[in-house]
Amino acid sequence: MIGLIGFGRFGRLAISYLSRDFTIFVYNSGDRAEAIRNAGAKPATLETTCRQETVLLCMPISAMESTLEKIAPLLNSQALVIDVCSVKVLPVKWMREKLPETVSLLATHPMFGPDSAQDSLKGQKIVLCPERIPDHRFKKIVAFLESMGLVVIETTPADHDKQIAVSLALTHFIGRSLSSFGAEDLLVDTEGYKRLLHILEVVENDTWQLFRDMHRFNPFAADARRKFLKAMLEMEKHLKSCI
């Protein structure tokens, strides 16, 4: 049985796949009981949710630290706590600081969402950072994820955040900037321009909160932005010098 905290878009996606193999108890701060049942899970109190063998944290990272403080005294002493945040260094730090030492910790980042994985998980990537978890338990989880068609990538929180600062945070930064610029479909276009517009499609369904959080809580995101903006200014200087 799994306890799931946070019934947002990703929480619903997780239920759609995990409910095929597990009974899932869901706690959400708002009254979503009917929607939770319709999704295939059981609405529950925070206490019941935290008593499960595995607890999956699906809230925004901005709410994670306070949530950890609430659930710490409620967890099963041998529970496995899994987060799905798009950054890893700070969530791991908070889980280590705030949760009992007997609790196992697995930091994850599913590299997909409700739009890209609506029909299948086959070929989708998931990053795992095994922070405090018995080897046999970790291997069992890896085998289960691979059986669902997922490609498992094992790395450290710091390495994950360095790479995701470019592949996710910077991509969303460019996408939001293109939107602010007013980029749109044009009759006279190029394949390169179409690929730029695809970035808009990637970010348009994500919230501003997610955008802000992936930059605010990733210790490497600001540096990636600075380097990118510096490179753009250098290109502008180059053009000014030769035009």
Predicted regions and their residues:
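Rossmann-fold dinucleotide-binding core
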Residues: 87, 91, 95-151
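Glycine-rich, N-terminal phosphate-binding loop of Rossmann-like dinucleotide-binding domains
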Residues: 58-60, 85, 130
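Short acidic-hydrophobic, aromatic-tinged amphipathic segments that line or gate anion-handling sites
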Residues: 42-47, 153-157
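ADP-ribose/adenylate-binding Rossmann-like module
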Residues: 74-94
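An accessory alpha-helical subdomain
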Residues: 154-243
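NAD(P)+-binding Rossmann beta1-loop-alpha1 motif at the extreme N-terminus of oxidoreductases
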Residues: 1-45
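Rossmann-like NAD(P)-binding element
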Residues: 46-75
